[in-house]
Amino acid sequence: MDELQDVQLTEIKPLLNDKNGTRNFQDFDCQEHDIETPHGMVHVTIRGLPKGNRPVILTYHDIGLNHKSCFNTFFNFEDMQEITQHFAVCHVDAPGQQEAAPSFPTGYQYPTMDELAEMLPPVLTHLSMKSIIGIGVGAGAYILSRFALNHPELVEGLVLINIDPCAKGWIDWAASKLSGLTTNVVDIILAHHFGQEELQANLDLIQTYRLHIAQDINQENLQLFLGSYNGRRDLEIERPILGQNDNRLKTLKCSTLLVVGDNSPAVEAVVECNSRLDPINTTLLKMADCGGLPQVVQPGKLTEAFKYFLQGMGYIPSASMTRLARSRTHSTSSSIGSGESPFSRSVTSNQSDGTQESCESPDVLDRHQTMEVSC
């Protein structure tokens, strides 16, 4: 394989300003389906056509969002077209969270998080999809992880943004951080997505999502989805012990990329998840100068990381990968964990003097530790 070139990546396109924020939420060339499952109806949006035996990229959004507000800025980003031309994309909306969704009838029992995960196999069967590469954010990351634990044969890879593997996570934390005791679900959701610094500094972005959550998402249905997420079980995943082959161990078997912004309220939860996963097939990506929605605020960086991830799985090997600057932190937890990682080289950039130190990932590095990169 030709040596990958590493250069500094900077975001070059403004996002979610008054001119293009709405446009980036739009779907282009998509087909919508309502699919019946044992746990109720689910709304999906298909983008592109399946490519032979390749997996489909399947997304699942976070609470307070739908596939449009969670993922369309990312998938409409110009550089993502290099990926989407090779893969069909299936966006899944949690029940009642899609645009213009009607309210559920009185007494409706919303699916649990486990049941939401079990709605996915009938979706794949209905659409004749054999396997997926999942991209989930927050609650969606939890659902896709549960799905992968229950059906490992259907999942080739996972990109998990802001995942919390624990039974109690950010919602309790977010509510306690708000001034006073509030029952405003919009404020709770905003505190779930964004840290205090971002809430105060990125006012345009916050206002865009405040209006979206309040006006575009059915509030009764949102309360039900929020309640389901608050009632989630611990994923109960365990990190394998080096040299011990225990098939009873509960862990993600597929290639996994964990993503979190360094200013996100989810940092501790993602680090906790990383500590429980198999370091052989897990990469932790911390995105600098980024808050709670990296796929919205820094789509260029995430696109480049996703390209590396897919290349590590054997897909799109000819993709242009020259923009992502990767740095290896100096803590012991940041050592490269596997020669099979999609990131085969690491670069530490010294911003003060402009020098770069190239660091290979040969066998001399500690293979018992997860690879951690930052960009």
UniProtKB/Swiss-Prot annotation:
Compositional bias (Basic and acidic residues) spans?
364-375
> What ranges does the record list as Low complexity composition bias?
330-346
One GO term under biological process is: signal transduction
Positions of post-translational Phosphothreonine modification: T322, T329, T332, T355
Task: Spell out the GO cellular component terms annotated for this protein, sorted alphabetically and separated by semicolons.
Answer: cytoplasm
- Residues with PTM N-acetylmethionine: M1
Short name of any one Pfam family annotated for the protein: Ndr
| Record keywords, A-Z | Acetylation, Phosphoprotein
Q: Where is the composition biased (Polar residues)?
A: 347-359
| List of residues that carry Phosphoserine | S331, S334, S335, S338, S341, S352, S361, S374
**What are the boundaries of the region Disordered?**
326-375
**What PANTHER family does the database record attribute to this sequence?**
N-MYC DOWNSTREAM REGULATED (PTHR11034)
- Family membership: Belongs to the NDRG family.
Q: What is this protein called?
A: Protein NDRG3
Classification of source organism: Eukaryota, Metazoa, Chordata, Craniata, Vertebrata
Gene encoding the protein: Ndrg3
